[in-house]
């Protein structure tokens, strides 16, 4: 029981009168003894007060350090300067001979088929000025440029087929072709001689200075709010959807038969860890050679997309602008069916649940898997495909 002491003070004038009436040998200088009065606070009130202090909510939107803001790409805390700097979009091969550096730092990672059922990756890097080595860099495919547009990113590639000429030649396209501007890359030790072109922050800045590209976002291009994020303190668990499916494993091997990638939900981290079995390689975690980290994502999106085969070489075309296609959104070990819309070159691809509401993504990195319409994949061995 908590106690508080209330001192009963004697009125000085009354004390003098009392001592004056005493025996002659008693002195007015004798000390006055003050008797404490003990008041007890009821136990239930004390516990209520303690609980009230303990239940004070933590404000998730208070920056951990001065000068930090929520990233427009991941909703994570980043330095305000990073948030105001345009990201870079880098084309990265995904084969057993690829030497991938810095890929685990991509805020958003796209994967899509190219010719021969191989996949190519494109990383959107917001904090690229703090990544020592990025790459290796490979050639462009025109449909990736439209996804890079959504972020107003500087698009970095190593040449590409003639199909890219129109979009790369546009005045508003701000790209760095490492064949044309050789100072943007350097050759370094790699698994083979065709996958050894890398870049770095100083080389990217040099290329941007050369072409006169602004470091900060251009006005009236990409949407300032791309993904819609749930509050960091109240993540989207998908429990509000009665038809949400279990998704502890997302297997994309039928869509990507050369990559054979899949994702396992990690309950300890709350993210999806990426694995793959590349043609000619062994199965295992997808690892960034720069830091030996496995690729991991808070959000995984499967985006069914109309496609065509362009020629006998197998070059593909994907319809990046659409309002009629669907897909799936996965997070926290569950998934829901979604539809998606992209209505302009720089407009964001937006995802909607079956109620027509825009899906709230969770704070963290996002994997976007572009699949050919009609292809199927599995979530916990349940086959899923487009609902046309």
Question: For the regions a protein language model found, what residue spans apply to each?
Answer:
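Positively charged n-region of N-terminal signal peptides that target proteins for export
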Residues: 1-5, 11
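Sequence-pattern detector for short linear motifs
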Residues: 5-7, 26, 73-75
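Bacterial signal peptide processing site
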Residues: 22-24
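A surface/extracellular/periplasmic glyco- and lipid-processing/surface-interacting theme
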Residues: 30-39, 51-110, 115-388
